[in-house]
UniProtKB/Swiss-Prot annotation:
Name by which UniProt lists this protein: ATP-dependent (S)-NAD(P)H-hydrate dehydratase
InterPro entries: CARKD, Ribokinase-like
GO molecular function annotations of the record: ATP binding; ATP-dependent NAD(P)H-hydrate dehydratase activity
Classification of source organism: Eukaryota, Amoebozoa, Evosea, Eumycetozoa, Dictyostelia
Family to which this protein belongs: Belongs to the NnrD/CARKD family.
EC number: 4.2.1.93
UniProt function note: Catalyzes the dehydration of the S-form of NAD(P)HX at the expense of ATP, which is converted to ADP. Together with NAD(P)HX epimerase, which catalyzes the epimerization of the S- and R-forms, the enzyme allows the repair of both epimers of NAD(P)HX, a damaged form of NAD(P)H that is a result of enzymatic or heat-dependent hydration.
């Protein structure tokens, strides 16, 4: 659906000499745990490689997670969070354009409690949210955390989608063994946007549905979902900024900007994965994909750097 790529192109910030730092996106990633340090890094560095100006990472001090992340890239602003204290994160929300919650979050009660408070605070100020990884398992335990918030994008893989389906079925009293369709889940949750990742990426808000079936790669290395989460977050922030600051955008877009942004992100990841696989084949890892973002972005959006 190249038409959706065309719809997204105007939302890409122009590279102008009179812009100041932050105008092309202030993104945050909340995640990481003593087991998973790579996930928030993949999300954050992908955001910067795509073109966001600033990326914060809120990561726990437990297990040296935040310290490890600080050594991975000087371009990322890493905030060590002591004892999963949400008050270390919430004051920053007003300065952000989007927050991505979940990459490498883990399943500790402290991390989940902190994430819940951050999501609630983000909702209170109408901040766009992308939920990925263990943040999806968190909301499966309490759908009210996200229900009705149409500025949320969920990016479940197959296992996470099944958990989400089971939780929504319980909420609506569906006792069948059937897996709900993503459109039904999105509708039941108040028309939030869902990106069901798979052989084809199904993107829906319950009212409209699009499918990204661009060629990707057959290799299934860890970290691809984290790259997508950071990419979705960045592109969603750009679309929000575009409609906020452009006076000639009164016309309602053909699709919700959450769907347009998510589709563009899925298409870019698939394209970069394909390019990486052509070089590295079976040895392809997530950093190979990230290293293709620069050229891959120019392939899809050739006018964006002019």
């Amino acid at each position: 659906m190249t038409h959706l790529i065309d719809l997204f192109k105007p939302m890409i910030p122009s590279l102008l000499n009179n812009l100041h730092k932050g105008q092309s996106g202030r993104i945050a990633i909340m995640g990481g745990s003593k087991e998973y340090t790579g996930a928030p890094f993949f999300s954050g560095i992908s955001s910067l490689k795509i073109g966001s100006d600033i990326c914060h990472i809120f990561a726990p001090t437990e297990g040296g997670t935040a310290t490890a992340l600080k050594t991975m890239s000087p371009d990322l602003i890493v905030h060590p969070i002591e004892k999963n204290d949400p008050s270390d994160i919430i004051p920053w929300l007003l300065s952000l354009h989007v927050i991505v919650v979940g990459p490498g979050l883990g399943r500790s009660s402290g991390a989940w409690s902190c994430a819940s408070e951050v999501i609630k605070a983000a909702r209170n100020i109408n901040l766009p949210i992308v939920l990925d990884g263990d943040a999806l398992r968190l909301i499966c335990d309490n759908l009210d955390i996200i229900k009705g918030y149409d500025k949320a994008i969920l990016t479940p893989n197959f296992v996470e989608f099944k958990s989400l389906s089971d939780s929504v079925k319980k909420m609506i009293g569906d006792t069948s063994n059937n897996l709900l369709k993503p459109e039904h889940i999105a509708s039941c949750l108040g028309n939030i946007t869902i990106v069901q990742k798979g052989k084809e990426d199904i993107i829906t808000d319950g009212n409209q549905t699009v499918v990204c079936d661009d060629e990707g790669m057959p290799r299934r290395c860890g970290g691809q979902g984290d790259i997508l989460a950071g990419t979705v977050g960045t592109m969603y922030a750009w679309s929000q900024l575009y409609y906020k600051y452009n006076s000639n955008t009164d016309d309602k877009p053909e699709y919700p900007i959450s769907i347009i942004s998510a589709y563009a992100a899925c298409s870019l990841l698939r394209h970069c994965s394909k390019k990486a696989y052509q070089i590295s084949k079976r040895s392809t890892v997530s950093m190979d994909i990230i290293n293709q973002i620069s050229n891959g972005f120019e392939d899809l959006f050739p006018e964006s750097s002019k």
